[in-house]
Regions:
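An extended acidic
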Residues: 4-96, 174-195, 272-284, 735
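Extended ligand-binding clefts on enzyme/binding-domain cores
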Residues: 148, 161-195, 281, 286-290, ...
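C-terminal capping/lid segments that line or modulate ligand- or cofactor-binding pockets
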Residues: 2-54, 330-333, 341, 384-404, ...
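Aromatic-rich carbohydrate-recognition surfaces in CAZymes
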Residues: 126-128, 151-154, 168, 224, ...
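Long, well-ordered core segments of solenoidal/helical folds
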Residues: 297-306, 349-372, 411-432, 474-494, ...
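Extended, loop-rich substrate-binding clefts of extracytoplasmic carbohydrate-active enzymes
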Residues: 69-114, 191-216, 429
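Glycan-association/targeting regions that enable binding to alpha-glucans and other polysaccharides
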Residues: 695-816
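Acidic/polar, glycine-enriched structural segments that form the non-catalytic walls/loops
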Residues: 1-9, 101, 112-119, 123-329, ...
Length: 816
């Protein structure tokens, strides 16, 4: 039919996505149904197909008009309620009611349990006084191939049935009710679409049969003469035939049969709830419900075409202000978030999904052992940076699966070895911390790296390579022995009573690869996302976050450690926000990532608001310290929105009603945040066990004791230390065999020492610095494989403890 009456006004206004705050997400628990949907404000927002990182629809909603006095769309003009169709399934009943009582729209929303079709069973209830006077329309905004531009819309006829069809490249969408349309139209958004048509005079006057190459919308009036109860279907395919056939195959099955199959599929996952069901006395009904929801959400965020791939969130934060030039959203893989989710499923007794995740990560790993900061589920990078904690997390997951005897026939040895080598070769500073905005020495990154290295060493030793295992443990010891030196200020100013506390990150100063200064009291941190004209540089020792709590989580530091407790006093004074639900914390002071202070969207700068995730992290620490955590659990549960979804951020300022910002309630950032749901699952498991689930016993056994360990310093090309303390073991590393040509007496007695190899492709030479050594260590490299000398000499000064104390005293006096 298309082409006879094309819509005017192309290509339409600039397309946008919808906001990141979702009330629910849903999908079938079957790999054959490769479609995911989201809900917000009573309507379907982004719909994903055929993979979980590909949103294809902006929104799908009903509109109502009497053709004379009013026109409504569900999102703007109704009062909405939402509930689950079944406690254990991600399908929903949504009721949208006219505030004036003229009508209500009841919707049951699921996906076909076996096909790529969204199904919305609809009852249009009309008040007696308005019977026969109201018209019902459906409006769909396709954003095919992850974009609003270059979409095409047309009306298709098949066997006497008309349906709406949208297409772009090889992706096709078909939309129709189980009854029939009485009118159909295709148009350009903002010019000739159905919403614009109805808003003009409350009538559907336009019936255009096509709108090509633009930001388009599909509109159809439901034929209510056939009844006010029907099922609306929206199907996808690789051609119009495939999409249309899928649509009508789904619609020909009684809706209740599809619901029964949909629910039965999700009930197969109930074994993952046993850890809570068997401990009902320890877990409240509310906690049990959110635990169940969290498990299902974690399972739902795994892709079905790429098994094991788990994204961070089915949302696009502040999507209402994002167009085609910002494709990523949070529907991407971050290894950090993914491993958190897989670990939570392990805590729930699921080993199958975490193993799939491990195998997926093994394939996604770069050849050099690193992982991209985030990536599409096919492995293509979105942001190409590398964060060391994201390299470390897969090692920890592999270790947990190994300890749980859950690796089946999969051998993660190469994945673990390559990641381990990357951490040692490219560390010890990270290009970005877990907040993805600053590089240097981060307590949270160091904690993850230390834990991962100890896990890797255990696995290496189990395979018979004790030599490499000991090498890895020694590097972990080096990191552990420097944590406080690198990330603790002795000149704290944020809380007058606490001078010594952990900081967020120490942005070390280097010059041509040489470390100029690793002192956290001398660094200056540049903050991202700051408002133009505002200050953006601060002394590093004035910026704090919660990252140091990861040291306790993994067993590197003891709960109750005085330095940990003092640091908590600082973050409570600087970052804590007491809300009606309970305490919550900001990421760090002067954070600019969040809803702007006037309530509008984050756009390159804003205000960092509290994160419920951090309430859960604090609860994990308090549990480890043996203290009551009820207040934190109740707070987190109070922050949940919709059907129990944790928001990334809650509004931390006074209410701004016209922007829908209310103190302690969700902002327009991501909902749900799967990292937070994973933390909640692990917290409840930890509470039941009275032991932190994430704690790694070999790590705690090594570091949470008073046993002395050798003092180690590491020199490598990307960390050319300038000084070493007498009595220290200096280990010199390189990624290739070398002969170290060196002297400790100003070249009077030069020596040659061949490097010792490891299975990681990293070689080393150890120099035990004599306690009485005074002359600097001087050295250069001969590279036998390349038959060349380095062409540069290096020096490491030797200092003595008394000398160091004196120098520090002089420096302090000078600063005073």
């Amino acid at each position: 039919m298309s082409g006879r009456n094309p819509a005017p006004g192309g290509p339409g206004i600039e397309p946008r996505w919808t906001g990141g705050a979702k009330d629910a997400v849903g999908t079938a628990y079957a790999i054959s149904s490769r479609i995911w949907f989201t809900l917000a404000n009573g309507v379907n927002t982004e719909i994903y197909y055929p993979t979980i990182d590909c949103p294809q629809v902006r929104d799908l909603q009903y509109m109502v008009s009497d053709e004379e006095t009013f026109f409504h769309d569900e999102r703007r003009n109704t009062i909405s309620t939402i509930e689950l169709i079944d406690r254990g399934a991600l399908g929903y009943k949504v009721t949208n009611t006219d505030p004036d009582g003229r009508y209500s729209i009841e919707k049951q929303i699921i996906t076909d349990p076996h096909l790529n079709c969204l199904l919305i069973h609809t009852k249009f209830n009309v008040a007696p006084a308005w019977q026969g006077r109201l018209h019902l329309y459906v409006l769909c905004a396709p954003h095919l191939e992850i974009g609003g531009w270059h979409n095409n819309a047309e009306i298709i006829e098949a066997k006497g049935r008309l349906f709406l069809h949208a297409f772009r490249e090889n992706t096709h969408l078909a939309l129709a009710p189980s009854t029939r349309f009485s009118k159909l139209s295709c148009g350009y958004v903002g010019a000739s679409d159905g919403w614009t048509d109805l808003a003009h005079n409350f009538k559907m006057d336009w019936q255009y049969d096509s709108a090509l190459d633009g930001n388009v919308a599909l509109t159809g009036e439901i034929d209510l003469s056939r009844g006010t109860e029907f099922t609306l279907g929206l199907a996808f395919g690789r051609s119009n035939h495939a999409a249309g056939a899928t649509l009508f195959q789904s619609l020909c099955v009684p809706f209740q049969s599809n619901v029964n199959s949909f629910v039965e599929q999700w009930h197969r996952t109930r074994k993952r709830l046993a850890v809570v069901d068997m401990n009902h006395g320890k877990v409240s009904d509310r906690a049990s419900c959110i635990f169940a929801r969290s498990i299902n959400l974690l399972l739902a965020h795994e892709d079905k075409l790429y098994p094991g791939a788990m994204i961070a969130s089915l949302s696009i934060p502040w999507g209402e202000d994002k167009s085609d030039d910002e494709l990523g959203g949070y529907h991407l893989v971050w290894t950090r978030d993914m491993v958190q989710g897989a670990t939570a499923l392990l805590a729930a007794g699921d080993t199958t999904t975490p193993l799939r995740a491990m195998i997926y990560l093994a394939i996604a790993q770069r050849e050099d052992g690193g992982f991209y900061q985030n990536f599409w589920i096919d492995g293509d990078p979105y942001w190409t940076g590398v964060q060391l904690d994201e390299v470390a997390f897969p090692i920890i997951l592999a270790w947990r699966l190994w300890k749980a005897d859950a690796l089946a026939q999969f051998d993660p040895a190469i994945t673990v070895s390559r990641a381990c080598a990357y951490l040692i070769r490219e560390g010890s500073t990270t290009a970005e911390d877990r907040w993805e905005e600053a590089g240097g020495y981060s307590p949270s990154t160091l904690a993850t790296n230390i834990a991962a290295l100890i896990c890797a060493a255990e696995m290496l030793e189990d395979r018979g390579d004790k030599h490499t295992a000991d090498f890895v443990r020694t590097y972990a010891d080096f990191l552990e022995s420097h944590v406080e030196k690198w990330t603790v200020t002795n000149q704290g100013t944020l809380l007058p009573a606490v001078k010594r506390h952990y900081i967020r990150i120490n942005p070390v100063v280097t010059q041509d690869g040489v470390l100029v200064d690793e002192d956290p009291d001398n660094g200056e941190l540049t903050l991202a996302n700051q408002k133009p004209g505002d200050r953006f540089r601060y002394p590093a020792n004035e910026i704090v976050d919660h990252g140091f709590l990861e040291l306790v989580r993994f067993g590197i530091r003891k709960p109750g450690d005085p330095l940990i407790e003092d640091s908590l006093k600082v973050i409570d004074a600087v970052l804590k926000v007491d809300t009606p639900a309970g305490p919550c914390w900001k990421r760090y002071n002067h954070d600019g990532y969040g809803q702007r202070g006037d309530g509008t969207s984050y756009k390159k700068w804003g205000v960092g608001h509290p994160w419920p995730l951090l309430t859960l992290e604090r609860a994990t620490y308090e549990l480890a310290a043996g203290r009551n955590i009820d207040v934190y659990i109740r707070a987190a549960e109070g922050f949940a929105t919709g059907v129990g979804l944790f928001p990334e951020q809650i509004w931390g300022l006074p209410d701004i009603p016209h922007e829908h910002m209310f103190f302690g309630k969700a902002t327009g950032a991501a909902i749900p945040l799967l990292w937070a749901h994973a933390e909640y699952v692990k917290l409840l498991r930890s509470m039941i066990d009275n032991r932190v689930f994430d704690r790694i016993e070999p790590v705690a056994a090594r570091y949470c004791n008073d046993n002395p360990r050798p003092v180690i310093e590491v020199w490598k090309m990307n960390r050319q230390v300038r000084k070493v303390t007498a009595g220290t073991l200096l280990r010199i590393l390189a990624p290739a065999p070398f002969v170290l040509h060196w002297s400790d007496d100003e070249w009077n007695t030069p020596r040659d020492t061949s490097s010792t190899p490891t299975a990681l492709g990293i070689e080393y030479v150890d120099i035990q610095v004599d306690p009485g050594q005074k002359a600097p260590l001087r050295f250069t490299f001969n590279w036998p494989e390349e038959q060349r000398w380095e062409g540069a000499n290096y020096a490491v000064e030797v200092e003595h403890p008394a000398q160091t104390v004196a120098e520090n005293s002089v420096a302090k006096s000078s600063s005073d």
